[in-house]
Amino acid sequence: IIYSPISPLQDFTPYTRTKGVLNLWAGVEKIVGNQTLTQPLCRMVDPGLTEGMVEWVVGHCLRHHLGMDSHIVNPDHVWNQTCPPLARERPVTILGMGALGSASAAALRALNFPVTGWSRTEKPGLLHGDAGLARALSSAAILVTLLPKTPETENLLNADRLALLPKGAVILNPGRGALIDDEALLAALDAGHVGHA
């Protein structure tokens, strides 16, 4: 069965001889909680999707690292010469180290960004769990969120966790919006604790 979250087919109970369900959409949050799904769930992994995400993540990390917005949005039309630190001096944390997070981390490391990876589950070489999340957030000049939306990740970045970020940190969220508590994020932006999101 090829699955779409907007399809009328949401009850898999009658399909006892089905070998599997293929999800072709970004995100699996709607189907993973489906109690009638007993068949194996497959998801599409396309190198082009990964490449596109890596380009987005690297592009936006460089945009903020180099301070491009101050040059693009310059109402005074005055050239403000600034010298950003080297990439090796701007730590990036990636929450979610699946295929997209791992590929993004590799590309950022190739540019000499120090990258900390965090995963909800224990994986070799990565931070994990609540203590690991606190450590990962505390060093993130740039935070990239690439986690799926699940009950465990919804509002993962609440006021307490946003407060762990260094002052002026940038949050890039190409993943799911529900990972961040919107009210807490707006308060952190208004207070100047988060520099950009």
Regions of interest found by a model, annotated:
Residues 2-72:
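Phosphate/diphosphate ligand-binding glycine-rich loop within oxidoreductases
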Residues 10-12, 31, 102-103, 153, ...:
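Glycine/Thr-rich phosphate-binding loops of Rossmann-like dinucleotide-binding domains
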Residues 38, 88-92, 168:
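Phosphate-coordination loops involved in phosphoryl transfer and adenosine-cofactor binding
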Residues 70-103:
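Glycine-rich NAD(P)-binding loop of Rossmann-like domains
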Residues 105, 109, 189:
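Gly/Ala-rich phosphate-binding loop of Rossmann-like dinucleotide-binding domains
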Residues 110-126:
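NAD(P)-binding Rossmann-fold cofactor-contacting core
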Residues 121-197:
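Rossmann-like adenosine-cofactor binding region
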